[in-house]
Curated annotation (Swiss-Prot):
Molecular function in Gene Ontology: N-acyltransferase activity
GO CC aspect terms: membrane
SUBUNIT field: Homotrimer.
Lineage: Bacteria, Pseudomonadati, Pseudomonadota, Gammaproteobacteria, Alteromonadales
Function: Catalyzes the N-acylation of UDP-3-O-acylglucosamine using 3-hydroxyacyl-ACP as the acyl donor. Is involved in the biosynthesis of lipid A, a phosphorylated glycolipid that anchors the lipopolysaccharide to the outer membrane of the cell.
Reaction catalysed by this enzyme: a UDP-3-O-[(3R)-3-hydroxyacyl]-alpha-D-glucosamine + a (3R)-hydroxyacyl-[ACP] = a UDP-2-N,3-O-bis[(3R)-3-hydroxyacyl]-alpha-D-glucosamine + holo-[ACP] + H(+)
Keyword Cytoplasm: no
BP terms from Gene Ontology: lipid A biosynthetic process
Protein name in UniProt: UDP-3-O-acylglucosamine N-acyltransferase
Gene: lpxD
Enzyme Commission no: 2.3.1.191
Record keywords, A-Z: Acyltransferase, Lipid A biosynthesis, Lipid biosynthesis, Lipid metabolism, Repeat, Transferase
Organism, scientific name: Shewanella sp. (strain MR-4)
HAMAP family: LpxD
Length: 341
């Protein structure tokens, strides 16, 4: 088990210890469930009552919250960011693979960097390049001509089709499929003609892709996911999409083809973005927002209808269907009221 003193954490987080700086911390926990040897955090004032009752050995607090706290604290600028840093330091997540399992199938042309680990029944295709300390989980398939940067981790049962490049320090979760064909077809007299998807996928450094998400390859050029992007579970990224640096996309969101999303965007869960659109840097879409036009300015956008009692929803639905009729009636009334007698 890893452990660290509060003094060491204060140096890591540029914080100030309030209490015993020799106290040893071995893990993180919530205020409600923390016990001795654990550090917790207060990032939301609605949990203030739990602060007074917590059994944590120490708590990450802002300077304001630390003023009235009598227990041991590490005072930092942002307690939630501090929590994330400490959680990384004390992380006990097992590796996706250790060593090279004898059942792994590795093409002789593949190049493996120092410290590469490959799990049981994984398949490594022709001309694949794996950087140093790459971890390939059991049952994962890496198609030909793929490149994976150092320290990247693929969990069990990930599939990379051919010509997919992953940067350094990426995490790809189980069930993710990267490089499958985009939805490209031409219609000739009612019959669909498949367009070969000859592009690839290019993913930058420090990208995380959630379980069962799908990233389609480009039709001609590449689908691009830039540095620092985080993608939740069950997200669909279509052919030739471009996602800018440090953008976050929550679960069950769907991007149609040739969408360009800027840097530092936050896309809420269950959003749908139509094809061939551009979304500016710094756009925030709340959950279940449907985007059908370009977004040129940063800001918060929403379109979903909030939940309500069924009887109220039914009434509003009927009224919505009557809006055009109501508009025409109002327009007629306004016209008649402006007519001189």
């Amino acid at each position: 088990m890893k452990s660290v003193t509060l003094k060491e954490l204060s140096l890591l987080l540029d914080g100030v210890v309030q209490g015993d700086e020799t106290l040893v911390i071995n893990s993180v926990a919530t205020l409600e469930h923390a016990t001795a040897g654990q550090i917790s955090f207060l990032a939301n004032s609605k949990y203030r009552a739990q602060l007074e009752l917590t059994q944590a050995s120490a708590v990450l607090l802002s300077a304001k919250d630390a003023q009235d706290y009598s227990g041991t604290a590490l005072v930092v600028k942002d307690p939630y960011v501090g929590f994330a840093r400490v959680a990384q330091l004390l992380d006990t997540t097992p590796k996706a693979a250790i060593g090279i399992h004898p059942s792994a199938q590795i093409d002789p042309s593949a190049l493996l960097g120092e410290g590469v680990a490959i799990g049981a029944n994984a398949v490594i295709g022709a001309n694949v390049i794996l950087g140093e300390n790459v971890q390939i989980g059991a049952g994962t398939v890496i198609g030909q001509d793929c490149i994976i940067g150092s320290n990247t981790r693929l969990w069990a049962n990930v599939t990379l089709y051919h010509n997919v490049h992953l940067g350094q320090d990426c995490i790809i979760h189980s069930g993710a499929i990267i490089g499958s064909d985009g939805f490209g077809y031409a219609n000739e007299r009612g019959q669909w003609i498949k367009i070969p998807q000859t592009g690839g996928v290019r993913i930058g450094d420090r990208v995380e892709i959630g379980a069962s998400s799908t990233i389609d390859r480009g039709a001609l050029g590449h689908t691009e996911i830039h540095n620092g992007v985080i993608i939740d579970n069950q997200v669909q990224v279509a052919h030739n999409d471009i996602i800018g640096e440090n953008t976050a996309i929550a679960g069950s969101t769907t991007l149609a083809g040739s969408v360009t999303i800027g840097k530092h965007c936050i896309i809420g869960g269950n959003c749908a973005i139509a094809g061939h659109l551009t979304i500016a840097d710094g756009v925030h879409l709340s959950g279940a927002t449907n985007v059908t036009g370009n977004m040129r300015e940063p800001g918060l956008y929403s379109s979903a209808t909030v939940a309500m009692e069924n009887k109220v929803w039914r009434k509003n639905t009927v009224r919505f269907r009557q809006l055009d009729e109501l508009f025409q009636r109002v327009k007629t009334l306004e016209k008649n009221s402006n007519t001189p007698e």
